[in-house]
Regions:
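Alpha/beta-hydrolase-fold catalytic nucleophile elbow
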Residues: 128, 188, 213-214, 263, ...
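Flexible loop/turn segments at secondary-structure boundaries
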Residues: 103-105, 132-135, 194-197, 217-222, ...
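Primarily recognizes the serine-hydrolase "nucleophile elbow" in alpha/beta-hydrolase
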Residues: 169-243
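The feature captures the conserved acid-bearing segment of alpha/beta-hydrolase catalytic domains
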Residues: 220-285, 289
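Proline/glycine-enriched tight loop/beta-turn segments at coil->beta junctions
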Residues: 60, 73-78, 85-95, 101-103
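Cap/lid segment of the alpha/beta-hydrolase catalytic domain
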Residues: 90, 96-165, 222-224
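Alpha/beta-hydrolase-fold serine-hydrolase catalytic core, especially in secreted/extracellular enzymes
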Residues: 2-66, 71-77, 277, 281-415
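Loop/turn elements at helix/coil->beta-strand transitions in domains of secreted/extracellular proteins
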Residues: 91-94, 120-123, 182-184, 205-209, ...
């Protein structure tokens, strides 16, 4: 632990004890949010968005997709696809998809979500995490380039902070759109994305609702998340030890922000759900309530038996939960329950859609019954923000290697 992190640990040990005895106050929550941002080097204030528009297309009947990019740390850019209903109206709810390891805006559940929820009347943003898609030096997907261990250890804190910054900038981008209701912005995070969203949802009060799937089972010292991928999860999570009971503190901050759902398959061995079980979540909810001094706003947890790692935000139960929080203009609970479903393994074969072989099995993504039907298989050329020539000119502002160089140049001994 660095000097700054050690100071935070001492400072917050007393504050955690105060929160336990008095209930978490707005002042204490503000201190925690500020400390999380400082620890992970999340800029405060965030960089100017400097939004650039790169064209649009219609991926499906009644749906428009915009190619955009926005700024993140060090004047770098995040390429994104933004889906919305073709018939424009003001004050729409909005949704952000936060990918799992190896995922990006090209992966099936990202664009499926975009089309699905645009049909519901929402604006949906999908983007490339650092090291994937158009932020990869070879413009490839599924590379997991950011998993390469970078020294010193502070680089892990900085990478976690970059991922949080990317997501916070997505929230800011949506909140300034004329067609988005800034009070109805939600995000859904899958696997690695569940961790990124767990942290972001604790500090970004612009988010109204959060859905964590294939994860969200934040545990204690030397648990699954401390020992998971070090650069994007393990080191960032360990660095938040100053919070004391990290899971309870993070979810208490969620409760003060808005509703949160954690949704998992009970056989999800990817993120160790079987070794946690339902009782783990019951206990965590109790600890959050104790920290808050009330059960109001404590996160919800739900499960599906006999299945493993899946992006459940494209399924009926999560869509119904989102409908209650966002009030989709073109859906009701009754229309959601009446919708057909799509067997993903059959759909990817029929449409020629790529899926990570590690997750293609029936107990994982392949067996998922996604809400809706008739979602097309979109191509890489459709989902690219830049042409190859444009990307070659822009890549210095996009790729992981540039970020590593810029981040390392900012490291000081005391950090």
């Amino acid at each position: 632990m660095g000097v700054a992190a050690s100071c935070l640990a001492v400072q917050f040990e007393q504050k955690t004890a105060e929160a336990d005895s008095q209930g978490l106050t707005a002042e204490q929550a503000l201190r925690w949010r500020s400390a999380i941002r400082t620890t992970l080097f999340v800029p405060d204030p965030l960089p100017p968005l400097a939004v650039e528009n790169h064209g649009r297309f219609e991926p499906a009947a009644g749906v428009v997709a915009e190619r955009v990019s926005y700024a993140t740390q060090f004047a770098m850019r995040v390429p994104a696809i933004v889906y919305s209903p073709r018939e424009r109206r003001r004050e729409l709810p909005a949704l952000i998809i936060v990918n799992g390891h190896g995922g990006d805006k090209y992966c099936w559940y990202a664009f499926y979500s975009g089309v699905l929820y645009a049909r519901a009347g929402a604006v949906v943003l999908t983007y490339d995490p650092i090291g994937e898609g158009e932020r990869n030096s070879q413009r490839k997907s599924g590379t997991r380039a950011h998993d390469t261990r970078q020294e010193p250890r502070q680089m892990g804190r900085r990478l976690g902070g970059l991922m949080v910054t990317d997501l916070m900038q997505a929230v800011s981008y949506l909140s300034q759109r004329a067609d988005v209701d800034p009070e109805r912005i939600a995000a859904c995070g899958y696997s690695m994305g569940s961790f990124v969203l767990a942290v972001t949802g604790a500090i970004d009060e612009q988010l109204h609702a959060c859905v964590l799937v294939g994860g969200g089972n934040l545990d204690g010292p030397d648990g699954y998340w401390d020992n998971s991928k070090p650069m994007c999860q393990g080191i960032p999570y360990q660095s938040l030890a100053f919070l004391g009971d990290r899971p309870a503190a993070i979810y208490a901050l969620h409760a003060m922000r808005g509703p949160t759902l954690v949704f998992n398959g009970l056989e999800d061995t990817v993120v160790a759900i079987p070794t946690h079980g339902k009782s783990f979540f019951d206990n965590l909810q109790d600890r959050v309530a104790q920290l808050l001094g009330t059960r109001k706003g404590v996160f919800e947890a739900d499960f599906v038996a006999h299945v493993s790692h899946r992006p459940f935000f494209v399924t009926e139960p999560v869509a119904l939960w989102l409908e209650r929080r966002l009030d989709f203009p073109l859906w009701t609970p009754e229309t959601i329950r009446a919708m057909p479903t799509t067997h993903i393994s059959e759909w990817v074969r029929a449409k020629g859609v790529a899926v990570d072989s590690r997750y293609a099995s029936e107990d994982r993504e392949g067996g998922l019954r996604a809400l809706g039907a008739g979602v097309p298989g979109l191509s890489r050329s459709q989902l690219s923000v830049f042409t190859e020539e444009q990307w070659e000119r822009q890549k210095g502002r996009l790729i992981y290697e540039t970020w590593v160089r810029k981040a390392r140049s900012r490291i000081t001994h005391r950090q």
